[in-house]
């Protein structure tokens, strides 16, 4: 919470240092963080939060700092921020960041096409998460899910049932 207020006040360097020294993983803090930011948004300078998050996507070497920034960007309308969307799509190709990026990309107008492109390129947990988010809206996607959806570097069983459900395998 203090870090968000530091960012809100424009104390970016101080916030970055504090973020780099945190001893937890963002996956466990995502929901409480976002709920708190939404609840306290009147006290938070969202423009500063957005500026900090976007800049860290390109400059931070700390995985959890990048995840923090991706979490923050989930609640900011980025449709017109083409450069930022491109950064998010690049980060999505790393299994480490795919889930966080999907939470941003799902808010775009062409979200399913973006998710489909990512799903085709990632192979580990990124593929598993992408399959969860991907909607089988046309034959091209359904065919890909049938032929490739289960292929991942983790465990095919993690996506098998989801793939079967999405393409309505029982009906085929």
Question: Model-derived features: where do they sit?
Answer:
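Extended repeat-based scaffolds of very large eukaryotic assembly and lipid-transport proteins
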Residues: 1-79, 83, 91-94, 98, ...
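Long, helix-rich interaction regions
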Residues: 1-10, 124-129, 133-172
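Positions within ordered alpha-helical repeat solenoids
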Residues: 39, 59, 71-78, 90, ...
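Buried hydrophobic core positions in alpha-solenoid tandem helical repeats
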Residues: 52-54, 85-89, 114-119, 144-146
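Alpha-solenoid helical repeat scaffolds
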Residues: 68, 87, 100-103, 129, ...
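Short linear functional motifs in flexible/disordered or boundary regions
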Residues: 81, 100, 113-114, 157
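A generic structural motif
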Residues: 102-104, 118, 125, 157
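Short linear, low-complexity motifs centered on an aromatic residue
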Residues: 109-127
């Amino acid at each position: 919470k203090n870090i968000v207020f530091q960012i809100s006040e424009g104390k970016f360097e101080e916030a970055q240092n504090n973020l780099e020294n945190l001893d937890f993983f963002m996956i466990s803090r995502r929901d409480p963080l976002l709920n708190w930011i939404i609840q306290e948004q009147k006290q938070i300078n969202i423009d500063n939060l957005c500026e900090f998050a976007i800049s860290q996507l390109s400059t931070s070497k700390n995985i959890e700092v990048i995840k923090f920034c991706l979490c923050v960007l989930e609640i900011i309308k980025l449709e017109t921020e083409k450069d930022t969307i491109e950064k998010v799509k690049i980060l999505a190709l790393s299994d480490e960041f795919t889930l966080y990026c999907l939470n941003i990309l799902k808010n775009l107008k062409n979200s399913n096409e973006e998710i489909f492109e990512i799903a085709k390129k990632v192979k580990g947990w990124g593929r598993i998460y992408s399959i969860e988010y991907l909607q089988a809206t046309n034959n091209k996607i359904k065919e890909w899910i049938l032929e490739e959806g289960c292929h991942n570097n983790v465990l095919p069983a993690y996506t098998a049932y989801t793939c079967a459900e999405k393409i309505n395998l029982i009906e085929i």
